[in-house]
Amino acid sequence: MAELRTQPALGRIRQVHMVGIGGIGMSSIAEVLLNRGYDVTGSDLERSDVTERLEAEGATIHEGHAAEQVGTADVVVYSSAVDPDENPETREAERRRISLIPRAEMLGELIRMKFGVGVAGTHGKTTTTSMAGLVVAEGGFDPTVIVGGKVTAFGSNAITGEGDVLVIEADEYDRTFLRLTPSLAVITSIEEDHLDVYEDLAAIQASFTQYANSVPFFGAAILCLDDPNVQAIVGDVERRVVTYGTTRQAEVRGENVRREGMTTRFDVVVRGERLGTIELHVPGMHNVRNALAAVAVGQELEISFERVRDGLGTFTGVRRRFEKKGEVGGITVLDDYAHHPTEIEATLDAAHQGFPDRRVVAVFQPHMYSRTQNFMDEFACSFFNADMLVLTDVYGAREAPIEGVTGGRLAERAEQFGHRAVHYVPEKTDLPGRLQELVGPGDVVLMLGAGDIWRASEAFVELLENDGGTAIERD
């Protein structure tokens, strides 16, 4: 671990207690605070490899929640998964008048201390943040990077550098990204989502516009011109705008895209000047756009193209983003976080690029009842590029069930729209056995969803390994 800074920057705050510290977002903040010399304590419902890693770095972590675990904390930070009115630790903080803040507010404080690069968007945030972090690191800035997923090149979901640049994933859910004031505000895409929070697309666009306008006068909004809903807000952004994409009007443009298996190459043209070729070790046009956002960040920080190219060349993926879980008996099993129709279409496109001439079997666990209800028909049509679709029931997350909103109903709609190979497996635990009956050598099994479908992917790989890598021969 890097040498600790001995002068904390949060006033007289010395001890930070984090409720829900094991979550992907909270744990990255904890790493940064530990690196800056703070005394970090925390709690979560259960221990994990994440909490073990934080304890190895100096945190004190409790399993379960109890009022006394707040201890002598100067501030208590709570996860978005925690109800502050119900949790005993947040209620204890209120009783004792200890500062009690949500995760997003702590992120805002961290970004205030540095030159912030915020990456927002309905799709592509995690990958783009990771790519931008690698570019900034290769540029010699020794950045701090906070990502909503474990990055293969980091070995973690955070880099705790000693430099003055902070690259951070900015989440639009519950408008939390409006607490951030980055110097560079990236917007990768805008689409209808989180309709439990936003009234409609116009409200989502207004929120992203406010985010873009939060940058200081010396900063810039970096916008993807390939996205029609981002195009629509360009005229409302009151700060300097830098555009990127594959369209001819983008200032940072990708051209001559060559897609060969798991490798994607494209040429970079910046304001009419051809700089050279980028080679990515991940498939999909969506990753070309993600990389172009990182190129634009590099341009703003005056990082040489060679450094940008080398930084992107080290990117090999993020956990649960087209992650290979195993290959047994000629069956390849992948896991991906895609949980929106547009993301599903992009991931299926990447699968066919990465594994040409192979059958792609999509296994989808819908995430949240409201999202499934709002996008039922869009989901049903998003799987036409899958040779076979296997559906299980909805992962409710924070929501109660909605009558008539099930994986079975989605399966019916997919068939009604014309998909010719749809299977419904209500119980997720039954997926491994059913998949063993449905797939065979040469198939690519792509598990999709933001819930716990990854458990089924691991169980399926284990089942194949235990059975000697064989699937049941299909007709």
From Swiss-Prot:
Q: Which InterPro entries match?
A: Mur-like_cat_sf, Mur_ligase_C, Mur_ligase_C_dom_sf, Mur_ligase_cen, Mur_ligase_N, MurCDEF_pg_biosynth, UDP-N-AcMur_Ala_ligase_MurC
Pathway it works in: Cell wall biogenesis; peptidoglycan biosynthesis
GO BP terms, alphabetized: cell division; cell wall organization; peptidoglycan biosynthetic process; regulation of cell shape
Q: What is this protein called?
A: UDP-N-acetylmuramate--L-alanine ligase
What this chain does, per the record? Answer: Cell wall formation.
Which family does the similarity line name? Answer: Belongs to the MurCDEF family.
- Which terms are listed as keywords in the entry? ATP-binding, Cell cycle, Cell division, Cell shape, Cell wall biogenesis/degradation, Cytoplasm, Ligase, Nucleotide-binding, Peptidoglycan synthesis
Q: Which GO terms of the molecular function aspect are on file?
A: ATP binding; UDP-N-acetylmuramate-L-alanine ligase activity
Q: Which residues bind ATP?
A: 121-127
An annotated GO cellular component: cytoplasm
The cross-references to HAMAP family, in alphabetical order and at most eight, read: MurC
Pfam families this protein is in?
Mur_ligase, Mur_ligase_C, Mur_ligase_M
Q: Which reaction does it catalyse?
A: UDP-N-acetyl-alpha-D-muramate + L-alanine + ATP = UDP-N-acetyl-alpha-D-muramoyl-L-alanine + ADP + phosphate + H(+)
Name its cellular compartments: Cytoplasm
The protein's Enzyme Commission number = 6.3.2.8
The source's domain of life comes to Bacteria
